[in-house]
Protein backbone atom coordinates (compact mmCIF):
# COMPACT_ATOMS: atom_id res chain seq x y z
CA UNK A 1 0.00 0.00 0.00
CA UNK A 2 1.52 3.38 -0.98
CA UNK A 3 2.39 5.96 1.67
CA UNK A 4 0.75 9.37 2.01
CA UNK A 5 1.56 12.11 4.51
CA UNK A 6 -1.03 14.41 6.09
CA UNK A 7 0.35 17.67 7.49
CA UNK A 8 -2.52 19.33 9.33
CA UNK A 9 -2.74 22.33 11.62
CA UNK A 10 -4.50 25.59 12.42
CA UNK A 11 -4.01 28.71 10.37
CA UNK A 12 -0.64 30.48 10.89
CA UNK A 13 1.00 27.40 12.44
CA UNK A 14 3.84 27.03 9.92
CA UNK A 15 2.48 24.23 7.72
CA UNK A 16 3.71 25.67 4.42
CA UNK A 17 7.29 26.22 5.59
CA UNK A 18 7.57 22.66 6.90
CA UNK A 19 5.92 21.22 3.78
CA UNK A 20 8.45 22.95 1.52
CA UNK A 21 11.31 21.62 3.68
CA UNK A 22 9.83 18.13 3.38
CA UNK A 23 9.80 18.41 -0.40
CA UNK A 24 13.55 19.07 -0.31
CA UNK A 25 14.15 16.04 1.95
CA UNK A 26 11.69 13.47 0.58
CA UNK A 27 10.24 12.63 -2.85
CA UNK A 28 7.00 14.45 -2.01
CA UNK A 29 4.47 16.36 -4.11
CA UNK A 30 2.16 18.75 -2.25
CA UNK A 31 -1.63 18.65 -2.51
CA UNK A 32 -3.33 21.62 -0.85
CA UNK A 33 -6.16 20.76 1.55
CA UNK A 34 -7.64 24.23 1.89
CA UNK A 35 -11.13 25.39 0.94
CA UNK A 36 -9.88 28.95 0.32
CA UNK A 37 -6.69 28.30 -1.67
CA UNK A 38 -8.73 26.67 -4.44
CA UNK A 39 -9.92 30.13 -5.57
CA UNK A 40 -8.16 32.30 -8.13
CA UNK A 41 -7.67 35.97 -7.31
CA UNK A 42 -7.70 35.27 -3.57
CA UNK A 43 -4.01 35.27 -2.75
CA UNK A 44 -3.29 37.73 0.04
CA UNK A 45 -6.18 36.92 2.37
CA UNK A 46 -5.60 33.19 2.06
CA UNK A 47 -1.82 33.45 2.65
CA UNK A 48 -1.37 31.56 -0.60
CA UNK A 49 2.22 30.33 -1.10
CA UNK A 50 4.35 32.90 -2.92
CA UNK A 51 5.69 32.45 -6.44
CA UNK A 52 9.11 31.66 -4.95
CA UNK A 53 7.61 29.01 -2.64
CA UNK A 54 5.62 27.48 -5.49
CA UNK A 55 8.78 27.33 -7.60
CA UNK A 56 10.48 25.37 -4.81
CA UNK A 57 7.49 23.11 -4.22
CA UNK A 58 4.51 23.23 -6.61
CA UNK A 59 1.11 22.83 -4.91
CA UNK A 60 -1.76 20.96 -6.53
CA UNK A 61 -5.39 22.05 -6.01
CA UNK A 62 -4.71 25.76 -5.64
CA UNK A 63 -6.05 28.36 -8.09
CA UNK A 64 -8.41 25.83 -9.67
CA UNK A 65 -11.73 27.71 -9.45
CA UNK A 66 -13.29 31.12 -9.93
CA UNK A 67 -14.68 32.57 -6.67
CA UNK A 68 -18.22 32.39 -8.09
CA UNK A 69 -18.09 28.58 -8.03
CA UNK A 70 -18.93 26.43 -5.00
CA UNK A 71 -16.73 23.46 -4.08
CA UNK A 72 -17.72 20.60 -1.79
CA UNK A 73 -15.90 17.97 0.24
CA UNK A 74 -17.01 15.47 -2.41
CA UNK A 75 -15.40 17.61 -5.13
CA UNK A 76 -12.22 17.76 -3.07
CA UNK A 77 -12.10 13.99 -2.52
CA UNK A 78 -12.51 13.32 -6.23
CA UNK A 79 -9.76 15.79 -7.14
CA UNK A 80 -7.40 14.75 -4.32
CA UNK A 81 -7.73 11.02 -5.03
CA UNK A 82 -6.91 11.65 -8.68
CA UNK A 83 -3.83 13.69 -7.76
CA UNK A 84 -2.70 11.18 -5.12
CA UNK A 85 -2.95 8.32 -7.60
CA UNK A 86 -0.92 10.21 -10.19
CA UNK A 87 1.78 11.08 -7.64
CA UNK A 88 1.98 7.55 -6.22
CA UNK A 89 2.18 6.01 -9.69
CA UNK A 90 5.35 8.03 -10.26
CA UNK A 91 6.88 6.52 -7.11
CA UNK A 92 6.50 9.72 -5.11
CA UNK A 93 4.72 10.49 -1.84
CA UNK A 94 1.51 12.56 -1.78
CA UNK A 95 1.94 15.24 0.91
CA UNK A 96 -1.45 16.69 1.82
CA UNK A 97 -1.11 20.04 3.57
CA UNK A 98 -3.77 22.34 4.98
CA UNK A 99 -6.28 23.21 7.64
CA UNK A 100 -9.67 22.27 6.16
CA UNK A 101 -10.27 19.41 8.55
CA UNK A 102 -13.55 18.34 6.94
CA UNK A 103 -11.63 17.58 3.75
CA UNK A 104 -9.06 15.49 5.60
CA UNK A 105 -11.81 13.60 7.43
CA UNK A 106 -13.78 12.94 4.24
CA UNK A 107 -10.65 11.69 2.50
CA UNK A 108 -9.60 9.46 5.38
CA UNK A 109 -12.97 7.93 6.21
CA UNK A 110 -14.76 8.10 2.89
CA UNK A 111 -17.78 10.22 2.08
CA UNK A 112 -21.36 9.37 2.86
CA UNK A 113 -23.41 8.50 -0.26
CA UNK A 114 -25.11 11.88 -0.66
CA UNK A 115 -26.89 12.63 -3.94
CA UNK A 116 -25.40 15.14 -6.36
CA UNK A 117 -26.92 18.60 -6.53
CA UNK A 118 -30.07 18.95 -8.63
CA UNK A 119 -30.40 22.45 -10.16
CA UNK A 120 -34.18 22.12 -10.62
CA UNK A 121 -34.83 21.11 -7.00
CA UNK A 122 -32.40 23.73 -5.73
CA UNK A 123 -34.14 26.43 -7.80
CA UNK A 124 -37.46 25.33 -6.31
CA UNK A 125 -36.06 25.69 -2.81
CA UNK A 126 -34.70 29.16 -3.66
CA UNK A 127 -38.12 30.17 -5.00
CA UNK A 128 -39.83 28.95 -1.81
CA UNK A 129 -37.31 30.86 0.29
CA UNK A 130 -38.00 34.06 -1.66
CA UNK A 131 -41.74 33.56 -1.15
CA UNK A 132 -41.90 32.18 2.39
CA UNK A 133 -38.57 33.12 3.95
CA UNK A 134 -35.71 30.89 5.09
CA UNK A 135 -37.23 30.56 8.57
CA UNK A 136 -40.21 28.68 7.11
CA UNK A 137 -37.86 26.32 5.30
CA UNK A 138 -35.86 25.85 8.48
CA UNK A 139 -39.09 24.93 10.28
CA UNK A 140 -39.67 22.29 7.58
CA UNK A 141 -36.16 20.91 8.09
CA UNK A 142 -36.71 20.68 11.86
CA UNK A 143 -39.84 18.59 11.19
CA UNK A 144 -38.18 16.12 8.81
CA UNK A 145 -34.67 16.05 10.30
CA UNK A 146 -34.51 17.44 13.87
CA UNK A 147 -30.79 16.66 14.21
CA UNK A 148 -29.82 18.65 11.11
CA UNK A 149 -32.35 21.33 12.05
CA UNK A 150 -30.62 21.83 15.39
CA UNK A 151 -27.19 21.99 13.75
CA UNK A 152 -28.01 24.27 10.79
CA UNK A 153 -28.89 27.89 11.52
CA UNK A 154 -31.87 29.52 9.76
CA UNK A 155 -29.45 32.20 8.49
CA UNK A 156 -27.25 29.63 6.70
CA UNK A 157 -29.09 29.30 3.37
CA UNK A 158 -26.39 27.20 1.70
CA UNK A 159 -26.48 24.36 4.25
CA UNK A 160 -30.21 24.67 4.81
CA UNK A 161 -30.89 24.42 1.08
CA UNK A 162 -28.57 21.41 0.77
CA UNK A 163 -30.26 19.53 3.64
CA UNK A 164 -33.70 20.01 2.07
CA UNK A 165 -32.38 19.17 -1.39
CA UNK A 166 -30.92 15.87 -0.14
CA UNK A 167 -34.27 14.89 1.38
CA UNK A 168 -36.28 15.85 -1.71
CA UNK A 169 -33.96 13.94 -4.03
CA UNK A 170 -33.46 10.78 -1.99
CA UNK A 171 -36.37 10.60 0.42
CA UNK A 172 -33.81 10.17 3.21
CA UNK A 173 -32.64 12.81 5.64
CA UNK A 174 -29.15 14.27 5.68
CA UNK A 175 -28.65 12.74 9.14
CA UNK A 176 -29.59 9.25 7.90
CA UNK A 177 -27.27 9.43 4.90
CA UNK A 178 -24.27 10.87 6.74
CA UNK A 179 -24.32 7.90 9.11
CA UNK A 180 -23.42 5.64 6.16
CA UNK A 181 -19.66 5.66 5.63
CA UNK A 182 -17.99 5.41 2.26
CA UNK A 183 -14.77 3.64 1.39
CA UNK A 184 -11.62 4.44 3.34
CA UNK A 185 -8.38 5.73 1.84
CA UNK A 186 -6.23 3.05 0.11
CA UNK A 187 -2.95 4.47 1.47
CA UNK A 188 -0.76 4.03 4.51
CA UNK A 189 -1.32 7.48 5.97
CA UNK A 190 1.20 9.15 8.28
CA UNK A 191 -0.60 11.95 10.09
CA UNK A 192 1.10 14.99 11.60
CA UNK A 193 -0.36 18.09 13.24
CA UNK A 194 1.69 21.25 13.74
CA UNK A 195 0.74 24.01 16.18
CA UNK A 196 2.26 26.12 18.97
CA UNK A 197 1.62 24.51 22.37
CA UNK A 198 0.99 28.00 23.79
CA UNK A 199 -2.32 29.37 22.50
CA UNK A 200 -1.14 32.95 23.10
CA UNK A 201 1.67 32.37 20.59
CA UNK A 202 -0.83 31.25 17.95
CA UNK A 203 -3.03 34.27 18.65
CA UNK A 204 -0.04 36.57 18.25
CA UNK A 205 0.94 34.90 14.98
CA UNK A 206 -2.62 35.31 13.68
CA UNK A 207 -2.70 39.01 14.53
CA UNK A 208 0.70 39.63 12.94
CA UNK A 209 -0.33 37.76 9.81
CA UNK A 210 -3.61 39.64 9.48
CA UNK A 211 -1.81 42.98 9.78
CA UNK A 212 0.75 41.83 7.23
CA UNK A 213 -2.11 40.99 4.86
CA UNK A 214 -3.61 44.45 5.34
CA UNK A 215 -0.24 46.05 4.61
CA UNK A 216 0.21 43.79 1.58
CA UNK A 217 -2.86 44.96 -0.33
CA UNK A 218 -5.69 42.82 1.06
CA UNK A 219 -8.21 45.65 0.76
CA UNK A 220 -7.40 46.09 -2.94
CA UNK A 221 -7.68 42.34 -3.51
CA UNK A 222 -11.16 42.14 -1.99
CA UNK A 223 -12.21 45.39 -3.69
CA UNK A 224 -11.49 43.78 -7.06
CA UNK A 225 -13.80 40.90 -6.12
CA UNK A 226 -16.42 43.29 -4.72
CA UNK A 227 -16.49 45.35 -7.91
CA UNK A 228 -17.06 42.34 -10.17
CA UNK A 229 -20.76 42.48 -9.41
CA UNK A 230 -21.41 38.74 -9.66
CA UNK A 231 -20.19 37.74 -6.18
CA UNK A 232 -22.31 37.80 -3.02
CA UNK A 233 -21.50 37.41 0.69
CA UNK A 234 -23.25 34.04 0.90
CA UNK A 235 -20.81 32.38 -1.52
CA UNK A 236 -18.26 30.04 0.14
CA UNK A 237 -15.41 32.12 -1.31
CA UNK A 238 -16.61 35.38 0.22
CA UNK A 239 -17.47 33.64 3.51
CA UNK A 240 -13.77 32.79 3.92
CA UNK A 241 -12.25 34.26 7.06
CA UNK A 242 -11.03 37.80 6.46
CA UNK A 243 -12.87 38.18 3.16
CA UNK A 244 -16.29 38.43 4.79
CA UNK A 245 -15.06 41.08 7.22
CA UNK A 246 -13.37 43.13 4.48
CA UNK A 247 -16.51 42.75 2.32
CA UNK A 248 -18.60 44.24 5.13
CA UNK A 249 -16.14 47.14 5.37
CA UNK A 250 -16.31 47.80 1.62
CA UNK A 251 -20.12 47.69 1.83
CA UNK A 252 -19.95 50.47 4.43
CA UNK A 253 -21.33 48.26 7.20
CA UNK A 254 -18.32 48.58 9.55
CA UNK A 255 -15.41 50.96 10.11
CA UNK A 256 -11.84 49.96 9.20
CA UNK A 257 -10.70 49.33 12.79
CA UNK A 258 -13.77 47.21 13.45
CA UNK A 259 -13.10 45.22 10.27
CA UNK A 260 -9.54 44.54 11.43
CA UNK A 261 -10.74 43.49 14.89
CA UNK A 262 -13.45 41.20 13.50
CA UNK A 263 -11.04 39.67 11.00
CA UNK A 264 -8.54 38.78 13.71
CA UNK A 265 -11.27 37.42 16.01
CA UNK A 266 -12.77 35.33 13.18
CA UNK A 267 -9.34 33.91 12.34
CA UNK A 268 -8.75 33.00 15.99
CA UNK A 269 -12.15 31.31 16.10
CA UNK A 270 -11.24 29.34 12.97
CA UNK A 271 -7.97 28.25 14.59
CA UNK A 272 -9.88 27.18 17.70
CA UNK A 273 -12.24 25.03 15.60
CA UNK A 274 -9.28 23.51 13.77
CA UNK A 275 -7.58 22.67 17.07
CA UNK A 276 -10.80 21.12 18.41
CA UNK A 277 -10.93 18.84 15.36
CA UNK A 278 -7.29 17.89 15.77
CA UNK A 279 -7.49 17.14 19.49
CA UNK A 280 -10.14 14.54 18.70
CA UNK A 281 -8.06 13.07 15.87
CA UNK A 282 -6.67 9.56 16.33
CA UNK A 283 -3.19 8.40 15.36
CA UNK A 284 -1.66 11.84 14.90
CA UNK A 285 1.90 12.92 15.75
CA UNK A 286 2.08 16.45 17.17
CA UNK A 287 4.81 18.88 16.15
CA UNK A 288 5.64 22.19 17.86
CA UNK A 289 5.51 25.17 15.48
CA UNK A 290 8.99 26.43 14.62
CA UNK A 291 10.86 23.59 16.32
CA UNK A 292 14.09 22.65 14.55
CA UNK A 293 13.55 18.89 14.88
CA UNK A 294 10.21 18.75 13.05
CA UNK A 295 11.67 17.88 9.66
CA UNK A 296 13.78 15.05 11.09
CA UNK A 297 10.78 13.59 12.94
CA UNK A 298 8.62 13.46 9.81
CA UNK A 299 11.45 12.08 7.67
CA UNK A 300 12.15 9.37 10.27
CA UNK A 301 8.49 8.30 10.33
CA UNK A 302 8.30 8.27 6.55
CA UNK A 303 11.42 6.12 6.38
CA UNK A 304 9.88 3.50 8.67
CA UNK A 305 6.59 3.30 6.74
Swiss-Prot record:
Cofactor(s) of this protein: Mg(2+)
Protein's UniProt name: tRNA dimethylallyltransferase
Species name: Aeromonas hydrophila subsp. hydrophila (strain ATCC 7966 / DSM 30187 / BCRC 13018 / CCUG 14551 / JCM 1027 / KCTC 2358 / NCIMB 9240 / NCTC 8049)
HAMAP family: IPP_trans
EC number: 2.5.1.75
Residue positions binding substrate: 11-16
Sequence segments annotated as region (Interaction with substrate tRNA): 34-37, 158-162, 239-244
PANTHER family: TRNA DIMETHYLALLYLTRANSFERASE
Gene: miaA
Amino acid sequence: MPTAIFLMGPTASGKTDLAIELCQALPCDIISVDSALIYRGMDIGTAKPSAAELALAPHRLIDILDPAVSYSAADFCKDALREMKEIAERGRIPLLVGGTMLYFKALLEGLSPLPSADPVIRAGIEEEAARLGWQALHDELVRIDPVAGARIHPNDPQRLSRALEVYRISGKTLTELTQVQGEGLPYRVLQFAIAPSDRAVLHQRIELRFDKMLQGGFEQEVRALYQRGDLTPDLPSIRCVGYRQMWDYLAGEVEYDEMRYRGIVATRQLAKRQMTWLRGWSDVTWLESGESGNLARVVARAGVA
